[in-house]
UniProtKB/Swiss-Prot annotation:
This is Ankyrin repeat protein OPG003. Ankyrin repeats may mediate protein-protein interactions. PRANC (Pox proteins Repeats of ANkyrin, C-terminal) region is found on many poxvirus ankyrin proteins, and is related to F-box motifs involved in protein-protein interactions. One of its GO terms (molecular function) is protein sequestering activity. May be involved in virus-host protein interaction through the ankyrin repeats and PRANC regions. It comes from Variola virus (isolate Human/India/Ind3/1967). The gene is OPG003. Residues 554-571 are annotated as: PRANC/F-box-like.
Amino acid sequence: MDEIVNIVRDSMWFIPNVFMDNGENDGHVSVNNVCHMYFAFFDVDTSSHLFKLVIKHCDLNKQLKCGMSPLHCYVMNTRFKPSVLKILLHNGVNNFDNKDNKGHIPLHHYLIYSLSIDNKVFDILTDPIDDFSKSSDLLLCYLRYKFNGRLNYYVLYKLLTKGSDPNCVDEDGLTSLHYYCKHISAFHESNYYKSKSYTKMRAEKRFIYTIINHGANINAVTKIGNTPLHTYLQQYTKHSPRVVYALLSRGADTRIRNNFDCTPIMEYIKNDCVTGHILIMLLNWHEQKYGKLQKEEGHHLLYLFIKHNQGYGSHAFNILRYLLDRFDIQKDEYYNTMTPLHTAFQNCNNNVASYLVYIGYDINLPTKDDKTVFDLVFENRNILFNAGVIHNIIHHRLKVSLPMIKSLFYKMLEFSPYDDYYVKKIIAYCILRDESFTELHSKFCLNEDYKSVFMKNISFDKIDSIIKKCNWDISRLKDIQISDTNLYTVLRTEDIRYRTYLKAIHLDSHISFPMYDDLIEQCHLSMERKSKLVDKVLNKLKSTIDGQSRLSYLPPEIIRNIITKLSDYHLNSMLYGKNHYKYYT
C-alpha cells in the first residue's frame, strides 16, 4: 500500500475536500483514500503496474465518510473506459446502489459527467438494481444535466420504466418534463432544418405521451409558477406546433398563471420567437376548452405583445393585425388609460408604433390621464436616450400636430447630453414647423433661471448653438424659390407637386443646409413614394370609371387633388384590398 500511496501522492498537486475523511487525512493522500484518488483523477491503464497494485491491495468497495466509493469515483473520471469498468466488476465491485452523502449512486455520476452515454455501460450500472424507487430522481438528474445536448432515448425509457419518479423536482421546482421541454426547444433550434423526420417531432411527442402515462404531472408548477407549457413557450427558439399540441392534448392547462401573473399564452406572446399559427392554435384551444376570451383579455394580450415584442419582420405585423382584428380593437380604444400606440411609444417599440400610425392611429391623441406620447417617453426612466425615441415620433412629421411640436420646447432641458445627433434633428424640425420656437427661446434667454435648469442634463450653450444654426439655415431655405413658393414652405407642407424641384435641390452638391439636408432627403423620398402611389390609384380609377359615374364629370386635376389628400394606408387599400399590408414599408 505504501508504494501505491507514494506513486499517487507524487502525482497529485491538489486534493478536493470531498476526499478528505473529515480531516482525518489532514489534506494528504493516505491508505484510506488512495484508491478513490486513483480512479477519480488518473488515466487508468489496465496494463500498468499501479493498476495491478490497486486491484490487488485496495478494497474496491470501500466508502469514504462522504459516501464515495471507487466506483463513484471512476464513473466521474473524464477518461472513463468501459474496459476498466468490466475489470472492476470482475474483481468484485458491487456497490451499484450505495449512496454518497448527496444521495447519489454511481449511476448519478455517470449520467452527470459522461459526455456520451454508452448503452452497454448504462446497462452494466443499472441491471444489478431491481428498480429505481430508492433513487427516484435519476430521470430528473439525466435531463437536468443533459437537456442542452442530444438525449439518449434508450436511457430515458429505461429510467422511466424501472421506476424513476417523473415528478421529482430540483431546488427550483423543475420536474423532468420541464427540463425535457427545455431540451426540445434548444435541440429543435439546431436541428430544425437537418431532416424532415425531425421536424415531425415523432420521438419528442412519443416521450411526452410516455412520461405522462407514467404519472408525470402535466401541470406541475415550479417555484416561480411555471408549468411545462410555460417553460416550453418561454424559450427563445423556434417552437413546434406538434409539441404544443402534444402538451395541450394531454391536459396542459392554459389558464394557470405563474408568479408573474402570466398564463402560457401570455408568456408566448411576450416571446420574440412567437409565430402566428401557434398563437392561433393556443387561442382556439383555450376558447374551445374554457370559453371565449373577453375583450379585456384581448387588450392585455395586445399590450404584452407590444411591450415585449419589438415587431421585427412581417410575422410580427401579421400577429399585430391578427390581435387587432380578433378582438376588434378600435383606433381610439383605451386599455389602462392608453391606446396601443401609447403603449408602443412608451416601450420604445418604434416598429409597431410606425405600423399603427400607418393604419390610422392618431399620434396626437392623449392618454385618459391627458398625457401625450412625449410625456410617456420622458416619464419612462428605463429610456436612457430619450431623444432617439422622440426623434422616432417626429419622424412622422406632418402627422404630429403643431401643439405637440410646441410642447417640446419645454422638454428640451430633459434631453441627455449624449443625444447630440437626435437633439439637433428634433430642434431643427421644431423650428421649421413652429415659428414661435425661436422667439420663445430668445425671450427665455433673458432669464438666468431658465439657463440654470439645463445644468442637470444637456447644456444651455449646446441648445443655444443648435437653435442659432437652425435659424441661419431657415433664412436660407426661405430665399430659395420653388415655382410659386419657397423651399421653406415646401418642407413644411410636403406638397408632392414640388417633388421634382426638391429632387433637384437634393441632388445639387453645391447646395447644402447642414441642419436640414437629412430632412430634405426624407421629404424627397416620401413625396416620390406618395406620387407613385397616387399615379397607380389614378390609373386604376381610369380603368373603372365609366360614363355613368359621377367621378367622370370631375376634371382630372380635381380627382388628383382628392386622391393626393388620402393617406398611404388608404391608397394601398384602394390598390390591393385586404392584401394592402404586404405593401407597408
